[in-house]
Amino acid sequence: MRALVIDDSRTMRRIIVGVLRSLGFDTLEAADGREALDVLESGVQVDLACIDWNMPVMNGLEFVLAARANREWRDVTLMMVTTESEHGQIVRALAAGAHEYLIKPFTADAIREKLQLLGLVEWEVSA
């Protein structure tokens, strides 16, 4: 599986990439929504996009709307990973087409659990 991490913070991208790689994902990075659309437009297959909300050029909500408007990208799972914690913002993102919403700061376990709920990571069965 391949994930696209979209965040204007290089440090945050590294953190999320590290978690995703530990879960078996190949990763790509983009610093804003426009750069992320360029990745998708290049034809690279992406299974998951982890999206920050507050970015220059094109913010996360604009990216979600653009991704959902293109039939070729409808199978990409979109997960917001952002500091935006107001209920209205969460509702807007989910209504726009995001599948899941994770508020920063987060733990690696929180990302894993969200991906398990989305069916992208297998549930661990304890013996």
Residue positions per predicted region:
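Charged docking surfaces used in two-component/phosphorelay signaling
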Residues: 14-22
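Short hydrophobic/Thr-rich beta-strand motif most characteristic of the beta2 strand and flanking loop
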Residues: 24-31, 39
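Active-site beta3 strand of CheY-like receiver
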Residues: 44-50
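Receiver (REC) domain active-site loop signature in two-component systems and cognate sites
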Residues: 55
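Short, glycine/charged-rich "phosphate-handling" switch motifs in NTP-dependent
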Residues: 99
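C-terminal output helix
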Residues: 106-115
